[in-house]
From Swiss-Prot:
PANTHER family: HOOK PROTEINS (PTHR18947), PROTEIN HOOK (PTHR18947:SF39). It comes from Caenorhabditis briggsae. This is Zygote defective protein 12. Gene3D superfamilies: Calponin-like domain. Residues 1-33 are annotated as: Disordered. The lineage of its organism: Eukaryota, Metazoa, Ecdysozoa, Nematoda, Chromadorea. Residues 244-405, 436-692 form a coiled coil.
Amino acid sequence: MLDLTNQESDSSENGNSKYADSTDGRGIGTSRRLDDEDLDERRKDLADLVFWMSGLKATTLPLDDHTSLCNGRAFAEILHEIDRSFFDERWLETMPEMRTSSNLVVKRSNLRKLWRKMSDYIQVLNRKVVSTRWTEIGDRLDGLDETDIPVAADLAMAVVSLAFIGKTQEKYIQYSQELPAGEHQHMMANVARLVQIVMEELPEVPTFHEISELDGSQNELNSSHVESSVITNGNGSAERRSTLSANDQVLVEAQLEIDELRSERDNLIKDVERLTKALESSQLDTSTCSEPNELSILEKQNEELRVKRRQAEERVLELEASMEHFQAIVVKLTDENDTLQSGQKELNMLKTHLDTAQSDVEEWRTIANKYQSDAEMLKKREKEVKELQGQVKSLTSRLEHHVKTATIDEDNKAGIVQLRSQIGTLTANNVELNVGLESKKRIVEQLELQLIQYKEKVKELEDRKEDLIAERNELENKLLFKESVTPRSLHESMFEAGHLSFDDKTKLPLEIENKRLTERIQELESLEPLKGEIIKMKSQNGVLEEEKLVITKQMEELERQVADLQEKLTKNQQHASGDVVELKVQLEKANVEVERMRETEMRTEAKLAGVEELLRKRNVEKEANETALQKAKAVIDELESRNRPVGEDNKTSVQDFKELKTENELLRQKNEALETALNTTTQSLEQENRLITSAAHQQILDRSSDSMMIMRAQAGSDHPQTLLDTQKMTRALPWRFGISSMLIIFMVWFFINTFCEVNAPPKA
């Protein structure tokens, strides 16, 4: 078990020597690294203290990690378990539980708050700190084992010692006695030694109840009492410190005077006893003494002793009267001291609240300065945005100029010249083909005329042939008829016809027929070359017909090409006019986007104006809080200067304290309202930032190549098919789109950075 009277604690002077390494010559903590041996010893001490604290089960935080202990939250929860009335829930809420261990500023602030509260508790316990072990303990943290382990060990020593000297010390003494003594005996002995060291460094302050006898000037004590209680001036905290130091000085002087009076009383009592014994012995020896000189000497000595005894008795009576008088004064001063201690406790609580409010005011002041710098930065960036808008206008005008000059003048002219050269070439080819066609047509017409003539001749020959055939048939019929008639009649007819002889008359038809047949044969023989020529003409006519068909097809192809070229020319002209219209539409859309960005800028300016208005309100409230803080400090100084019992000067100091508490509560509510308004503003700014970011990303996506093709299709133009469309798509539009995209991306980046800086949380 833990024994505070252990003999091992006698070596506290030697055991305390290792702690001198963590302080400099003035006793102020430094971050000088310890040796490995000293560091291991401090780690062992911390482990023993952690074992004792872990049995309390006052916290769920890890106690075996010195980094977590240096946050201060675990020690605060253990102190809350030790004395719930002093280390209350409200104070415990001011010690945040950190999720990260790398923020040294917050850790140092937590340790300073923790030690201030522990110092107040030590004063409440009527003790004082005479060691420099905990001086500026928060500033000794450097995030290293060589600095953090000694700090954690010193705080653990103080926390465990407060458990043994606090109001609930019986509970923890009983707890220490119930711990197993066998396996942890050395650990408990080490804890007892450390607690003994701390108790020597936190001695009790002597009170007036310890004063038994007082001697000296009553006026000096009364004047000291009057000087400590009456208001001498209104200089605030400086007078308060001088008054407290004067009270301590009076107490020390009174204690010294009491010790002197005690020693003087003891000496006088010893002298009285010695003289009494000498008197008794002298009376016994009177009978034996015969010399008158010796008797006279003894009588003189006896008389002197009686006088001294009488003086001593009178002195004792005076001292008893003074003691009774001073006992009444001591009782009165004790009551005043109790009242002052209670008032000091309330003042300490009020100081804590005021320190918290002052730190909050400093944080708000830092935030206000940051917002003011952000507002100035926003104004500068607003000027930059205006300059960029002017550049956008100039770029837009240059874009229109380049689109009109480069796209219409160069591309359209080059395409039209090329098309005209193609049309000229095709027209020349068409003229040549038309000339050839005309010559071929004339040849065909001549051949057709010759063919018609030959056909007429053939028709005439065929008619002649038919006539000859009909005549031959008629002659044959006649010949047959003549053969069928009588010879007389035939003879007569032949005689009548030519007065020929009978024999000649029979030969004449045959000769005629023979002659006719010969002529017919000659005619037929003369028709044979004509038939060959007819066949030849027919073959030539067929060839010419085929050439005519080929030429006709070529003419149709040329006409189709001319029509296609004319159609392409018409489409190019339509595309040129349509692209100009499309560019105008895109410019209108760009203007709409610029207007939208202007509206966004106006909204941002409105938000900025709101933030500036909020900053102005925060500044006004900050000034009001500072004014209230100054008033509270003045009231505190006045109350501390009036540290006297209630009703002594017909005023109620408790009522003033209540008023200050009420005012402090109002200030805390104002701070909470300001925090709520700040959180609301931050959320609205974050929402606006997200909306602007999403709108900017949507605009960037809308300006992609796919969306441009969709916009082109919606505008009524087809995909690029001509040289002009290809040149426009590859030259005119991409660089304009690139400039617009870069401008939008820059503005989005600007707004994102601006709102991120505005919404950044304040650094501790």
